[in-house]
């Protein structure tokens, strides 16, 4: 995100923008890709609440959060674009406020990948995860990415 220092992420987190809601999609490719036509749109604070539930030493991929929200709200899938935006908003909102911290660094991208859009980028996320006992590995030579090693073993389960 650009101009993070000028944005009020806590105000963005509080806005519901008409969500939550279920939207029926009609595009055949989208239905085939996600396995259904009922797309759940969750407000940013729902992502924040789930991110806050991940305990010390555990991690959760964004995909697991999306699956949980769809399953518990009678939908086939959640919107992947807003999900990515809303976890970034939750991270930056936590970074901007004092108290009531959201442990955003525990929410990973697919495959256990660290999120470069979080405050401080992948290096800050790496330090926080290593402080919780995780091992971070680097992949790639030109397009370097960082991952939590054996992330599946540390996954938090949403019930």
Regions found by a protein language model. Give the residues of each.
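Nucleic acid-binding interface residues in structured DNA/RNA-binding domains
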Residues: 2-159
């Amino acid at each position: 995100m650009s101009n993070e220092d000028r944005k009020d992420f806590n105000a963005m987190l509080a806005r519901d923008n008409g969500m939550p809601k279920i939207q029926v999609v009609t595009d055949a490719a989208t239905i085939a890709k996600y396995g259904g036509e009922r797309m759940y749109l969750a407000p940013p604070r729902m992502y924040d609440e789930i991110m806050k539930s991940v305990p010390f030493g555990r991690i959760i991929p964004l995909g697991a959060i999306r699956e949980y929200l769809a399953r518990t709200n009678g939908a086939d899938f959640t919107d992947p674009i807003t999900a990515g935006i809303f976890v970034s908003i939750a991270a930056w909102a936590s970074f901007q406020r004092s108290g009531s911290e959201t442990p955003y660094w525990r929410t990973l991208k697919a495959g256990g990948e660290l999120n470069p859009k979080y405050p401080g980028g992948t290096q800050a996320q790496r330090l926080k995860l290593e402080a919780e006992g995780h091992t971070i590995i680097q992949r790639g030579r030109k397009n370097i990415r960082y991952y939590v090693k054996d992330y599946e073993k540390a996954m938090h389960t949403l019930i």
